[in-house]
Each structure stands twice: as C-alpha cells, then as structure tokens.
Amino acid sequence: MQENLKNDKLKIGKYEFDSRFILGSGKYSLELIKSAIEEAKAQIITLALRRANTGEIANILDYIPKNITLLPNTSGARNADEALRIARLSRELGCGELIKIEVISDSRYLLPDNYETIKACELLAKEGFTPLPYMHADLYAARAMRDAGAAAIMPLAAPIGSNKGLCAKEFIQILLNEIDLPIIVDAGIGSPSQACEAMQMGVSAVMVNTAIAEAKDIALMARAFSLAVNAGRVAFLAGVASVSEAKASSPLTGFLRD
C-alpha cells in the first residue's frame, strides 16, 4: 500500500507532482507566502501576472522558492483574446507554459465565462501552452475544453471567495464520471473538511486561496489543508464505505443469546 501511495502522482500534461494541493497566492502579503508554501507542502502555486511585474519593487517571484512550479492565471481577462495576451506576457516573464485560464466578464458574481474560456483553450493550446481552464461544472463545456486542448479542468465548487464549499458537488461528480482529464476543484472551498470531501470524491487536486489567506494563522491553516487533502486522497484510494441504512458493526447473535 505504501508503494502505491508513493507512486500516486498528479499528472498534468507532461508534468508530474507528488502534492495534490495547489496554493493560491492572490490574497497573501508577500512576507507570508513562503511560510504558507512550506507548511502546505505544495509544489504548485498560482499567481496573477500583476503580482509578477518585474518593474515593481516588491515582486512575488522573489518570495516563491525556485523548486515550486508556477501556475500563472489570466486574471483580469474579459474574453479569449485578452487571456491570450496575458498568457503571452506571462511566458515572457519566464513563468513557463502552464497557464490557468480565467475569463470573467461579470464583475458582480465573478463567474467564469465558459464560452470565451473554450475559445481561450484553443488559442493557447495552439501556441504551445498547457491550459487549465477555470469553469462552471458543465459537462458540455468541459468536453469542448478537453477537445480544444485543455490539460485539466478546474470547476468551481462555489462562487470565488465565498468559502461555501461543494455547492456544485453533483455537477463535479458528472465531470469525474465523463471527462478523462484531471479534475481540479477551484474556488469556494472554505475549510479543510471541504477539501477532504472533494478529494474523497476522486478529484485530482484542490486549489485553495481565500480560506487560507483569511485564517488567523495562515501557515497553520495551510498545513491543515495539506493534511486534509492527503487524507481525502488516501480515503479515496482505500475505498470510502457507501452510505446505507443501520447495520450492526459487531455480531448480534452467537454470544449472550445462545
């Protein structure tokens, strides 16, 4: 069993990772990012391009260890063309070809635009990027993103920053059943228990930002999420018991009654 766990890798395109916990960085102070990464034992961290501006005095890239894989996002893009421009700038800054596609034109609810995201997947894949689209958990859109070149699908669990948990659980389960790509739950996860629940479903990884950034002790909460993600993954591999009616866990006959 230990050997199976050792060989249990998160595979995204040509990349492999031991950790299935992806850390967001959009709400941390720069000074806290390194300690959060260390406690999370994360190997991937997302970042917005605006925080990696090499012309600024404070550059987030200076606070991220060199052995951590960067997952820049296209935050701020309102359509596919804008997402492509941001991705190109990210690559010029040396952030690599992995890219999380975020296309959001709705400023009130901050919901991803699945239609423009599909277009962005195709554009970025043609230019050699490894796109990971952030999207609504919609089967038809997920199929289109897969066909357009997505390396993984990142459905939201609940509205971004809401900490409401697995509101889209049933729809995420459909993606797990039907899409042969890594499914990475992104947005809305508010507690370690919710992250564990997502991993028990069989998702490939969980990405968390707000729930850690708003904790009283950021580093300790990052550790809690890391443990929860690992526990959920091990539980999934072990085979979580199905829900049923009351059933005795010990024999009721053959002792006092005989």
Swiss-Prot record:
Any Pfam family matching the protein: ThiG
Molecular functions per Gene Ontology: thiazole synthase activity
Record localization: Cytoplasm
Pathway in which the depicted protein is active: Cofactor biosynthesis; thiamine diphosphate biosynthesis
Subunit relationships: Homotetramer. Forms heterodimers with either ThiH or ThiS.
Family: Belongs to the ThiG family.
Protein name stated in the entry: Thiazole synthase
Lineage, top ranks: Bacteria, Pseudomonadati, Campylobacterota, Epsilonproteobacteria, Campylobacterales
